[in-house]
Regions:
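Small-molecule-sensing regulatory modules
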Residues: 2-44, 49, 69-98, 106-291
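Short, structured active-site "lid" loops
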Residues: 44-65
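Signature of uroporphyrinogen-III synthase
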Residues: 57, 98-102
């Protein structure tokens, strides 16, 4: 029987971002809206769509060998699964998300201790209970099935909700008074899968390529030609990931320079390179950067 890795893809808010990340990493996943078993162009992987909230449970039970989910849901589950790698991406951005304690803007609540005896609505029930317990604050934590932002002040006094930008909370006239936890996506695996040499190698391959795709998102490649007489001036401008690659051109007076830099600084660096003597400057996108 051929080796096969059973991989959980998060259904819901992370689904599109995850499929797009796999595409940049070299795998095409095709998700039919009616099927929970997406196809993938790798005969060694079998995909299944699972909600991020349940991923740790199915990995722990051995239904899946590995899966992608937020570390928040792993902590919430309390299950003993392993993290293969951290992958910092979310629905809208390439940064961690926060679970925050939020209250109505019009309220006098300024800190967790002000909520003694109050009702807190959240999806992250156990984590929320632990948070208030560590502060010695007695509250009633209620599970929220969604639309949590609209519950204060009529259905709850405060909420613990996940946010990337805070814009949804502001739109619902809520203010953040504390951060309960930060979270980011992890590739998790069962202990049994990690003990299998082939599955471990396959998971390491996936982790390497996914990390490479994430690292490449904020980077661009840059190549240019420069006269040897101006090379030191050009190199002084470049904030390289590693030392730039310098190649001799057919004209002995000229060399080619290749490097990688953050996309956000390219707009400032390119004019300075030109002023320092760079010519034929080309910026190009990167699919993967494997460090």
């Amino acid at each position: 029987m051929a080796n096969k890795l059973r991989l959980g893809i998060p259904k819901g808010s992370l689904q599109d971002a995850t499929i797009a990340l796999f595409k940049r990493a070299g795998w095409n996943i095709y998700a039919d809206g009616r099927s929970y078993f997406p196809s993938i162009d790798d005969s060694e992987i079998e995909c299944m769509l699972i909600r991020a909230q349940e991923m740790a449970r199915y990995v722990d039970h051995g239904v899946l060998d590995a899966g992608l989910t937020g570390i928040d849901w792993v902590v919430e589950s309390g299950l003993d699964v392993a993290s293969v790698t951290t992958l910092t991406y979310a629905k809208q951005s390439r940064r961690k998300v926060r679970w925050v304690l939020a209250v109505p803007e019009s309220s006098d609540y300024e800190k967790a201790e002000d909520l003694e005896g109050k009702i807190i609505a959240t999806e992250l029930v156990e984590t929320c209970k632990r948070y208030f317990a560590t502060k010695g604050v007695n509250v009633k934590v209620e599970f929220s099935w969604g639309a949590t932002e609209v519950k204060p002040p009529m259905l709850a006094d405060a909420i613990v909700e996940v946010t990337e930008t805070g814009s949804s909370l502001k739109a619902n006239h809520l203010k953040i008074i504390d951060t309960v936890m930060e979270s980011e996506t992890h590739l998790i695996a069962s202990k049994a899968a990690l003990a299998d040499a082939w599955k471990r190698q396959k998971m390491d391959q996936i982790a390497t390529m996914l990390r490479g795709a994430i690292d490449a998102q904020a980077q661009v490649g840059l190549m240019l030609n420069v006269k040897r007489a101006n090379l030191d001036a050009v190199l002084a401008v470049l904030p390289a990931l590693n030392s730039p690659t310098i190649s001799q051109l057919s004209d002995s007076e000229w060399v080619a320079v290749n490097t990688i830099l953050e996309e956000r600084v390219a707009r400032d660096v390119i004019p300075r390179l030109k002023a320092a003597g760079g010519a034929g400057i080309v910026e190009y996108p990167l699919n993967k950067v494997v460090l």
